[in-house]
């Protein structure tokens, strides 16, 4: 199992894209757990970054979409992020979004563990319903990443986690009923989260994974919005 985990990290170390973190290696120096070594990002993560009200989240979403498209369509085999959310997107020195903190399932399932503050508490808000339900459909996939992308879009435009202010149990219950987040109605958020952006969210939240847009299509939509 550990050898398989190391192979997965090795695969991630081969990823080369401006919107995907460069994996330099792994270490067990911190509490004996397996941690990924990567370049330090001075600007922190996207969730904290957009708390600065002068930041336009649109270009960040463009970068996230570009990173996901690279992962989902790479020639060496598709890679699924599996844990996309604002706190797992870092901001480079030039202000670009960089996908980080992949959910490396082999590492998580091994005797080692990946430690991420708040992972168990908040990931549910971004997770596709088929993942929450488990079973055959409960695997990482491009479709599940697209659902999480829509939630991350909402997060960065509202500067709040999806389904705010509902508790974990309330979120799980709402999703089980086929309900997605309500559209914000406050003037400040609406000035950023226009009809085009909101429609993009809604399409990503289709409860049928096969009816969600591909990230390539989402990227094309965002490029048109950004023009």
Where are these regions (language model features)?
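Conserved short submotifs of the Hanks-type protein kinase catalytic core
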Residues: 31-45
């Amino acid at each position: 199992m550990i050898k398989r985990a190391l192979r997965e990290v090795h695969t991630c170390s081969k990823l080369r894209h401006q919107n995907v973190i460069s994996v330099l290696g792994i270490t067990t120096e911190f509490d004996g757990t397996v941690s990924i070594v990567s370049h330090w990002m001075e600007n922190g993560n996207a969730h904290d970054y957009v708390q600065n009200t002068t930041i336009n989240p649109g270009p960040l979403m463009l970068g996230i979409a570009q990173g996901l498209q690279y992962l989902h369509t790479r020639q060496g085999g598709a890679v699924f992020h599996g844990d996309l959310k604002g706190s797992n997107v870092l901001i480079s020195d030039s202000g670009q979004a960089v996908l980080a903190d992949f959910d490396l399932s082999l590492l998580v399932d091994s005797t080692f563990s990946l430690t991420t503050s708040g992972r168990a508490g908040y990931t549910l808000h971004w997770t596709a319903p088929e993942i929450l339900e488990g079973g055959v459909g409960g695997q990482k996939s491009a479709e599940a990443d697209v659902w999480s992308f829509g939630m991350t879009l909402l997060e960065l435009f509202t500067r709040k986690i999806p389904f705010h202010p509902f508790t974990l149990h309330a979120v799980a219950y709402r999703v089980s009923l086929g309900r997605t987040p309500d559209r914000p109605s406050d003037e400040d958020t609406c000035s950023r989260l226009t009809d085009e952006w909101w429609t993009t969210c809604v399409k990503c939240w289709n409860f049928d994974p096969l009816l969600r847009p591909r990230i390539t299509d989402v990227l094309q939509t965002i490029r048109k919005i950004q023009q």
